[in-house]
From Swiss-Prot:
TM segment ranges: none
InterPro entries: UPF0178
Annotated protein name in UniProt: UPF0178 protein Maqu_2186
Species: Marinobacter nauticus (strain ATCC 700491 / DSM 11845 / VT8) (Marinobacter aquaeolei)
Disulfide bonds: none
Pfam families: DUF188
Record family assignment: Belongs to the UPF0178 family.
NCBIfam families: PRK00124.1 (NF001095)
Length: 150
């Protein structure tokens, strides 16, 4: 049950947590990005650099992942596709995307995009915090305990 990381927007502290977990649990973790990223050497950690372009990294993740894999992404449409294919998905803040909540998350994303395009909303998400880091680490640990030894 490998882990696939949409690494283009993955915060460095989350990459570090994932790398430590990959080594500790000996679980294959692949970071996919359209730019070079720094990762520690490990037989359990790999990176794939894809060309720049719309959804290129997303498409690579979808082509490679399988049912039961874990996908880490902030991209809600990618999360929806991965869930449809049977993956477990959560974002770098540790929030799980599920069959039960993904439609609502997509609707909210689309609504906020419309509001931004209309100039009604100008801000983005809150800055990444220590609490977000802890929530992610806890969520990852729970997933690994359930899935890594299967």
């Amino acid at each position: 049950m490998p882990i696939w990381v949409d690494a283009d927007a993955c915060p460095v502290p989350i990459r570090e947590i994932l790398c430590r977990a990959a080594t500790r649990w000996q679980i294959q973790t692949t970071f996919i990005a359209n730019h070079a990223i720094s990762l520690p050497p490990s037989p359990h950690i790999s990176r794939r650099q894809v060309p720049h372009g719309f959804d290129v990294a997303d498409n690579e993740i979808m082509d490679q992942m399988s049912k039961g894999d874990l996908v880490i992404t902030q991209d809600i449409p990618l999360a929806a596709e991965a869930i449809e294919k049977g993956a477990d998905v959560f974002n770098p803040r540790g929030q799980a995307f599920t069959k039960e909540n993904i439609r609502q998350r997509l609707a909210m994303r689309n609504f906020m995009e419309e509001m931004r395009n209309a100039g009604q909303v100008t801000g983005g998400p809150a800055p990444f915090s220590q609490g977000d880091r802890k929530e992610f680490a806890d969520q990852l640990d729970r997933w690994l305990q359930r899935n890594a030894r299967k």
